[in-house]
Amino acid sequence: MSADGAAIQSELARPPCPTGVGTASAQADGAAAARGASGALRMQVHEWAEAPLAARIAWLGRLQDRVARGAEALVDEICADVGKSRWEALATDVLPLVDSIRWHRRHAARVLSGGPVAGRPWWMVGMSHRVDRVPVGHVAIIATWNYPVQLLGIQMVQALVAGNRVTVKPSERAPRSQRALLELFSGELPRGTLEWTASDRAAGEALLRDRRFDHVVFTGSTEVGRSVAETCARTLTPTTLELSGCDSAIVLADADPALAARGIWEAVTMNAGQTCMAPRRAIVDARAWPRFIEALAPLVGASGPARLVSEQSAARVAECVRDAVAGGGRPLRGVVEAPSGVHWRPAAVAGGSLMSDLARGAHFGPALAVLAADGLEASVALHRRFDQHLAVSVWCSAARARAMSRDRSMLAALGAGVVTFNDAVRPTAHPATSIAGRGPSGWGASRGEAGLRAMSRDIGVSCTSTRLRTPSGEPTASVQSIFRRLTGLGRARRAVAGLDSRGTRPSADPAGSEPRARTPQP
């Protein structure tokens, strides 16, 4: 082991950093001091990046143990921050994080390892080529609140195992749970590897204004995402933006209506509708419409009040439902209830205007617009009228699902980064699955293999022999002729010379002759 490797392993064995590091003391520093410290650190390769990948993966194993032991404490803080039930906090926040850590322990070495590059042209004789992967450097993560432990935790796992320094701006809506998570992560890390700011909005604005990063990861609304993109564009800082998804569940004629209604409604009401990949509208084939509505209505009627993150969120989703009903939609519950503080009873509205805020998904709560379409093409066309595509679900027969799941043109037409068949939201928890938005839903990949690769950068490396190497300078005419024959360039030049101005080979028929029909052979 090298001296550097031994020093890193010694550092990894140290007791955890004091909790003040990266928190209160960092907040007390002035903007100028922060810029100076950031600049000094950027001038050197950080020691965590110098740690062998095997050492960083071993740290993941110890992190997994700490998260598992601290699961109940994390659940307490999640419930206090955002009001989830204990089961939902455990199943949708803590468990996916533990599964992701386990997956990265098994697969990070493969994803992050470089290797030789095949396909060297013959004229590059004496050269060897490979691609190496190194950390991007210093990563800023601006965290969100709806899955405060799962989303931030996975993003930190990927940035840290790739060897980066990380600075986190916690969400102002989830300060307790994310502070607890950060303290679990900071154990055993070299000092300065993981820092965090205050959780208020001013801290987020100052983070990008006063400091420079090599990559910024943001999860949140499209409006704020645009602001982050504009700020980072001034310094050409790469970003990963995981923004709003207002997607569709497409129910085809051969779908099991009871299964579709149950699966879609479960996704709509999960986490009180505060899931960016949850469906905001169900587009139902007219032939399946009566059975689907019949199956969905009792599920809507049986739903109890959901707790949203704020009174404003509850009021907004209730307003969208009222407007959809006023525009001609039919509430499947029969009445539209007013919110009670942060609590509101989930609702679904059948029919109505395609341009309503409910149909467009202009809310973040447990409400569903149910729209009709005639067949698959019309369903996809209606889905594409809405511009935010993150995760689409398609409900159909098992045989049709198998065929459509392999139809690349159909998958591309849906426009989303994730397509699920006969399920919604839950399959996206697979730790190898990446989330990649397009257009108003963001850009760049987070989670999965693509998200992990995004936390590193490629370096193309070549070594040329000092003895066997391609001669420099322009070769003689005879050597150039041999070169053309060996590379096929001579044949290509003759072929191009035989084409007319339109890029087609001239006909052998006499000029002006009419094309003749082919004579059938007896």
List where the protein language model places each region.
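N-terminal Rossmann-like NAD(P)+-binding subdomain of aldehyde/semialdehyde dehydrogenases
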Residues: M1-S128, A302-P305, P506-P522
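Residues at or immediately preceding the N-termini of alpha-helices
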Residues: A31-A34, L53, A71, P257, ...
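Structural signal for hydrophobic packing residues in well-ordered secondary-structure cores
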Residues: V45, A49, Q64-V67, A71, ...
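Residue-level signal for inorganic ion chemistry
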Residues: R56, I101, G163, L194, ...
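Rossmann-like NAD(P) dinucleotide-binding subdomain of oxidoreductase/dehydrogenase enzymes
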Residues: G119-L259, I283, A373, R502, ...
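Conserved C-terminal structural/oligomerization subdomain of aldehyde/semialdehyde dehydrogenase
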Residues: S2-D4, C17-G20, A24, H343-P522
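Alpha-helical structural signal in soluble globular domains
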Residues: Q64-R66, E77, V98-S100, H104-R105, ...
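ALDH superfamily catalytic-core signature
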Residues: G5, Q9-L12, G20-A28, E188-L189, ...
